Amino acid sequence: FLFFFLTVVFFQVSFGQNIEFIYELVYRPNVDDEKTNKEYFSLLYDTDQQQSYFKNITGLEENWASKNEIGFNTQVFKNFKENKFYLLDKVLSKFYKNDFKKINNWMITNDSKYILNHKTYQAKIASGGRNWVAWYSAEIPFADGPYKFNGLPGLIFEITDTENNYSFKLVQILKSNKNIILPNYTSLNDDDLKKLKKKTLENPSSNLMLAINQMKGNNMGFSVTFDNKNIDEKEMAEQLDKEIKEFNKTFNNPIEIGDVWLK
């Protein structure tokens, strides 16, 4: 990624189409290790509908490649017209929708600096058990930013927590013909989602075995291949349990302190 484009677009301003903001995230997945991971994200902003969609795009193009395992799978949808905001959390292969409120308790300071030739101003906030420092620019008049951060008088160019566990930086701005298309999801409130994550971590293969038993009940056949070998349902369950628990040992520093991190 050494030649990753730092593209600057000067808006003069007729926002008649969608705009895609590419962010680089550098974060510490493990609280007991200083090693960092690097991943890339798209914030697709629909200028007509005033809504946005944030998701991981690591590996989709050569410039967005990463040597580490992708760990940050949370997607975020924001609809500023209707004041609707929600996270789409991935638990195994399914997405679960969890609403959150618009962020409006920023503390704006007098500090400023230039980022990508745009003048930005500093703002601070406490969120998810962390203290964050953001840099935003009113030159791009969208009250949006990476992850669930929003509510400032301009686009967030950078935001980092004060312990340097997570750091988002805007690296590219693109005109886009893409449309916002959300994955299928199930709605859960915050408490129920946390319970589901904890239950899944305790026994990751339980839902898989339930689905297999349902297929058997419907006389549906199935086979699973792992490492080019056919494996039975018991081996499949053991492999899934091992994979999820090993992932959780490495990825134990979620962006929201106290959350359970699942792939």
Whereabouts are the PLM-identified features?
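Bacterial Sec-dependent N-terminal signal peptides
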Residues: 1-21
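A sequence-composition feature that detects small, non-aromatic residues
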Residues: 7-9, 13, 65, 123-126, ...
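Short, surface-exposed loop and linker segments with low hydrophobicity and enrichment for Pro/Ser/Thr
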Residues: 12-19, 78-80, 142-153
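Extracellular or lumenal secretory-pathway regions
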Residues: 15-115, 119, 132-133, 164-263
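Glycine- and acidic-residue-rich phosphate-binding/metal-coordinating active-site segment common to enzymes
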Residues: 113-115, 119-174
